C-alpha cells in the first residue's frame, strides 16, 4: 500500500511517467510531498531558486537567504499538480518571516498536501471503504550572517504522513499504523562575492527513516542537495535581467537512514548516480512600473534524466507596493503535467 501511494504521489509531481513511477530515486522515499516546490516564481524559472529565495519561500528553498531580510514577509501557494488525472490532489504552503536586527531572522512555514481519495482493502482485496491520505510539515527557520557576504541558515521540521484511515494496517504478515511521524533539518549557505552574483547551496530533509509498518521496513526521507548560482548581467533604474541555474541531487537511501546525505552519493553505480542529477535553469526580466511596483516575465527549463522529464516553464509576476502575485505554467503535453498552473501570493510589511 505504501508503495502504491508513493507511486501516485510521484506521478502527480511529474517526476516520472506512470510506467516509471518506481524507477526514480525519489520514489523510494517517505514524505515525498516535501518535494512539492511551493513558489510560482521559482516554478516559472525551472525551479532554479536556491541562490535567489528572496521572499518568505526561503524557509523552503534556502534558510540562509533569511539573513538579508529587513522586513516581515508572507508567502502563500495553492495548486493542483495533476488536475487532468486527479482533481482531489492538491498542495498548499504558507510561510512568514520576521527580522531581528543584529541577531538574525526567523521564519515559520507549513505545507499540507492532500494525496486524494484512496481505497482501503483487506488482504484478500475486498473493499473496506474510501479515505483521504495526506502529508503535513511544520518548519521553524533561522538565518544569519557569518560574514558580510556569507550567510547560513537552518530549518527544523516536524513531518507527518497519513496513508491509511486504519490504525491496524496489514502488509503481508505484518501490521502497522499506516501513518508515520519524523523530524528533519534543512541547512543552507549563501555567498555573495559581489552585488550581482550569488552562489548558494542547500541540504534538505536530513532526518531518520520514517516507520509505517515496522523499523525494518522504514522508508528514508527525501533528502536532497542543491547547488545554485544566480547572476544579474544587466540592471538599470527601470529594468533588470536575472539568470539562475541549479544542480539538484536526490539522496534518499534506506540503508543510510539519517546519514543518507552521505551514503546517497555512492549507493548506486556512478552512471546511475549521475543520471539522478536534475539540471534547472531560469531567467527573469523585470520592469519597474514605479518605485514600489514592477512587472516580470520569466522562463526556465527543467531536465530530469531518470524521471524522463525535459520541461520548459514560463510565468509572470506582478509587484504592487507591498503585495506580489506570481503565476507559472509547465509547457508539457504529457498527461501528468498538462495544464499545470501554479499561483503564489505574498506581501511584506
Label each region the model flagged:
Residues 20-349:
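Subset of outer-membrane beta-barrel
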Residues 1-32:
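Cleavable N-terminal export/targeting peptides
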Amino acid at each position: 500500500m505504501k508503495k502504491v501511494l508513493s507511486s501516485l504521489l510521484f506521478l502527480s509531481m511529474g517526476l516520472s511517467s506512470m510506467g516509471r513511477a518506481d524507477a526514480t530515486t525519489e520514489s523510494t522515499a517517505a514524505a515525498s510531498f516535501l518535494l512539492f516546490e511551493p513558489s510560482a516564481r521559482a516554478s516559472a524559472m525551472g525551479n532554479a531558486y536556491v541562490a535567489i529565495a528572496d521572499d518568505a519561500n526561503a524557509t523552503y528553498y534556502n534558510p540562509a537567504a533569511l539573513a538579508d531580510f529587513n522586513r516581515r514577509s508572507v508567502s502563500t501557494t495553492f495548486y493542483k499538480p495533476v488536475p487532468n488525472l486527479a482533481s482531489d490532489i492538491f498542495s498548499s504552503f504558507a510561510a512568514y518571516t520576521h527580522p531581528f536586527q543584529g541577531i538574525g531572522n526567523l521564519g515559520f512555514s507549513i505545507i499540507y498536501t492532500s494525496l486524494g481519495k484512496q481505497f482501503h482493502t483487506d488482504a484478500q482485496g475486498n473493499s473496506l471503504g474510501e479515505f483521504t491520505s495526506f502529508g503535513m510539515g511544520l518548519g521553524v527557520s533561522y538565518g544569519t550572517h557569518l560574514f558580510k557576504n556569507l550567510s547560513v541558515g537552518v530549518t527544523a521540521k516536524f513531518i507527518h504522513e497519513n496513508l491509511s484511515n486504519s490504525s491496524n494496517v496489514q502488509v503481508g504478515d505484518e501490521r502497522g499504523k499506516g501513518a508515520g511521524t519524523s523530524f528533519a533539518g534543512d541547512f543552507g549557505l549563501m555567498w555573495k562575492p559581489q552585488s550581482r552574483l550569488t552562489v548558494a547551496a542547500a541540504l534538505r530533509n536530513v532526518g531518520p527513516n520514517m516507520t509505517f509498518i515496522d523499523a525494518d521496513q522504514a522508508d528514508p526521507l527525501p533528502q536532497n542537495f542543491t547547488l545554485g548560482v544566480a547572476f544579474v548581467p544587466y540592471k538599470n533604474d527601470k529594468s533588470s535581467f536575472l539568470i539562475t541555474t541549479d544542480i539538484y541531487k536526490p539522496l534518499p537511501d534506506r540503508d543510510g537512514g539519517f546519514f543518507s546525505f552521505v551514503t546517497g552519493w555512492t549507493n548506486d553505480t556512478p552512471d546511475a548516480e549521475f543520471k539522478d542529477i536534475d539540471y534547472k535553469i531560469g531567467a527573469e526580466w523585470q520592469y519597474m512600473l514605479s518605485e514600489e511596483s514592477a512587472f516580470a516575465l520569466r522562463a526556465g527549463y527543467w531536465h530530469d534524466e531518470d524521471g524522463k522529464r525535459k520541461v520548459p516553464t514560463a510565468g509572470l509576476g506582478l509587484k504592487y507596493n507591498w503585495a506580489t502575485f506570481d503565476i507559472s505554467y509547465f509547457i508539457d503535453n504529457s498527461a501528468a503535467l498538462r495544464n499545470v498552473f501554479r499561483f503564489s501570493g505574498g506581501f511584506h510589511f
